[in-house]
């Protein structure tokens, strides 16, 4: 078999079907000293690895290829991956993939011996038939489709992912371009779940729809701000002074570049929403934040903002007045639709957020499981 790199010891064997948790934990990076073999069924592994959004090349040569991905820790992944002990990374899963073609196995074309490592602690060994599609802008990113997976005998020694040198810079800027595309209300607008005020996941298409400013209105936002969607503006207007834990955006990764930190993804994510809406589903919100931003949405001063859609009965609409309204004393103040557009994200960008943001992933999973199709 081709060399797989530096080794580390395996965990001692346990009873069939058990997955003993290693006792030792090493370093702030959340790595452990031992690795356990998974007894998970092939179908479950196939669903998990084929759900990965993007794989990033760690290193590659004629004998060995190593890939890595980061993704939200979904319910299926919880069956094979232990949480990262770092609180800032506990909601995510890191997967390493080692691919070799040992001569002794006499594998047919496009077939590989694969080692999957989940959060560097559990591994699964398999023979896989592989199809790869490279990113149009860089050979360092690709999507991988695994077929005809069958469990394989683990090697006597295992490579150590902690020895790999990992890039810390993005290779593509997926959110740098014009990813907000003006749209009309889609078919079946009620087949959706709310991600934030004026932001929805459309179940039939698997795409995000959200209300956002155009570039002219966006130029009036505070310097350095990248966010343009309605939920972000409402949060700036209504969040209480000083903020709280709920006001801060949750941890995000950049699943398109396999990076643990990305301010671009965090700021642009449609999960950003007013604090009281996010933690209490409150739809009437006092203006406690930056009132100077109110003219971006209302033609007259307002002291209260009202979100007009109940979170449990969402419906995508291209009429802004069906999403948000304002009040000044006893007077109703409609929003100014000039400069605002209902936009749709491409399927690719939508999946980027669904695999980078735990809030979006959780909302989509919950809605998909209850969708009668």
Swiss-Prot record:
Please name one Pfam family that this protein belongs to.
Herpes_UL16
Compartment(s) of residence: Virion tegument; Host cytoplasm; Host nucleus
Which residues lie within the region annotated Disordered? 1-35
Q: Which InterPro entries match?
A: Herpes_UL16/UL94 (IPR004286)
Identify the stretch annotated as signal peptide in this record: none
Q: Which UniProt keywords apply?
A: Host cytoplasm, Host nucleus, Late protein, Virion, Virion tegument
- Basic and acidic residues: bias regions: 22-35
Repeat found in the keyword field: no
- Tree of life domain: Viruses
Major place of localization?
virion
Comp. bias intervals (Pro residues): 9-19
- Give any Gene Ontology cellular component: viral tegument
Which family does the record assign? Belongs to the herpesviridae cytoplasmic envelopment protein 2 family.
State what this protein does: Plays a critical role in cytoplasmic virus egress. Participates in the final step of tegumentation and envelope acquisition within the host cytoplasm by directly interacting with the capsid. Upon virion binding to target cell, a signaling cascade is triggered to disrupt the interaction with the capsid, thereby preparing capsid uncoating.
What is annotated about its quaternary structure and interactions?
Answer: Interacts with cytoplasmic envelopment protein 3 and with the capsid.
Q: What is this protein called?
A: Cytoplasmic envelopment protein 2
The encoding gene is: UL16
């Amino acid at each position: 078999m081709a060399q797989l790199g530096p080794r580390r010891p395996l965990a001692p064997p346990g009873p069939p079907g058990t997955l003993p948790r290693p006792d030792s934990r090493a370093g702030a990076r959340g790595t452990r000293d031992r690795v356990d073999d998974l007894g998970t069924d092939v179908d479950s592994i196939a669903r998990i690895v084929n759900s990965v959004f993007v794989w990033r090349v760690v290193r590659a040569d004629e004998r060995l290829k190593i890939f890595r991905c980061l993704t939200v820790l979904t319910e299926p992944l919880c069956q094979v991956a232990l949480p990262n002990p770092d609180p800032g990374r506990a909601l995510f899963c890191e997967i390493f993939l080692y691919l070799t073609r040992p001569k002794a196995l006499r594998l047919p074309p496009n077939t590989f011996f694969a080692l999957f490592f989940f959060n560097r602690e559990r591994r699964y060994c398999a023979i896989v038939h592989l199809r790869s599609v490279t990113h149009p802008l860089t050979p360092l990113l690709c999507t991988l489709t695994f077929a005809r997976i069958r469990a394989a005998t683990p090697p006597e020694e295992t490579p150590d992912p902690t020895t790999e040198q990992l890039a810390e810079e993005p290779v593509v800027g997926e959110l740098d371009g014009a990813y907000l595309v003006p749209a009309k209300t889609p078919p079946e607008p009620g087949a959706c779940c709310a991600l934030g005020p004026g932001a929805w996941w459309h179940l039939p298409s698997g795409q995000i729809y959200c209300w956002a400013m155009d570039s002219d209105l966006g130029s009036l936002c505070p310097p350095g701000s990248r966010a343009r969607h309605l939920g972000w503006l409402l949060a700036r207007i209504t969040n209480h002074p000083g903020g709280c834990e709920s006001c801060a955006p949750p941890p995000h990764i950049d699943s398109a570049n396999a990076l643990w930190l990305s301010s671009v993804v965090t700021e642009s994510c449609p999960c950003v929403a007013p604090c009281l809406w996010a933690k209490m589903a409150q739809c009437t919100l006092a203006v406690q934040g930056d009132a100077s931003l109110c003219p971006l949405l209302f033609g007259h001063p307002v002291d209260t903002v009202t979100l007009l859609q109940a979170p449990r009965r969402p419906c995508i609409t291209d009429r802004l007045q069906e999403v948000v309204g304002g009040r000044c004393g006893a007077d109703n103040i409609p929003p100014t639709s000039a400069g605002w557009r209902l936009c749709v994200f491409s399927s690719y960008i939508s999946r980027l957020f669904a695999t980078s943001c735990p809030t979006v992933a959780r909302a989509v999973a919950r809605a998909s499981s209850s969708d009668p199709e």
